[in-house]
Amino acid sequence: MAAAANLPAFLAVGAGAALGAWLRWALGLLLNPIFLTIPFGTLAANLLGGLLMGASLAWIHAVPAMSPVLKLLLTTGFLGGLTTFSTFSAEGLHLVQRGEWGWLALHAAVHVAGSLLMAWIGYAAFTAWRG
């Protein structure tokens, strides 16, 4: 198994993914009851994930010598576990099944545009903070 040959990377991805998934789950528990048509927990996870991905990429670019294992922990692991394209897809399918086309369009637009905007903000904020 290739992953066994690189145990630190394997463990970093797994640990990061567990932490990210736990945060996503907690956001769902906290925010999904607020508005039942569009689950805010998934939206919050995707927007926060976009923001943190932008900041992480800026950090990675600012520190070329950063450990590849730390990069994997942050991006593939934690942010991969936090962000929720499969959950987003399932929630979109539920809107389709209920014929809620307007909510579906809003759901998709806010997740995609919002995540891209948050990634840009995260990158810009880290770059400005770093100077």
Swiss-Prot record:
Its main location: membrane. Na(+) is not transported, but it plays an essential structural role and its presence is essential for fluoride channel function. GO terms for molecular function: fluoride channel activity; metal ion binding. It comes from the Bacteria. Na(+) binds at G80, T83. Keywords: Cell inner membrane, Cell membrane, Ion channel, Ion transport, Membrane, Metal-binding, Sodium, Transmembrane, Transmembrane helix, Transport. The chain crosses the membrane at residues 3-23, 34-54, 62-82, 101-121. One of its GO terms (cellular component) is plasma membrane. It is found in: Cell inner membrane. It is a multi-pass membrane protein. Signal peptide: none annotated. One of its GO terms (biological process) is cellular detoxification of fluoride. It catalyses: fluoride(in) = fluoride(out). It holds the Pfam family CRCB. Fluoride-specific ion channel. Important for reducing fluoride concentration in the cell, thus reducing its toxicity. HAMAP family: FluC (MF_00454). Belongs to the fluoride channel Fluc/FEX (TC 1.A.43) family. This is Fluoride-specific ion channel FluC. It comes from Aromatoleum aromaticum (strain DSM 19018 / LMG 30748 / EbN1) (Azoarcus sp. (strain EbN1)).
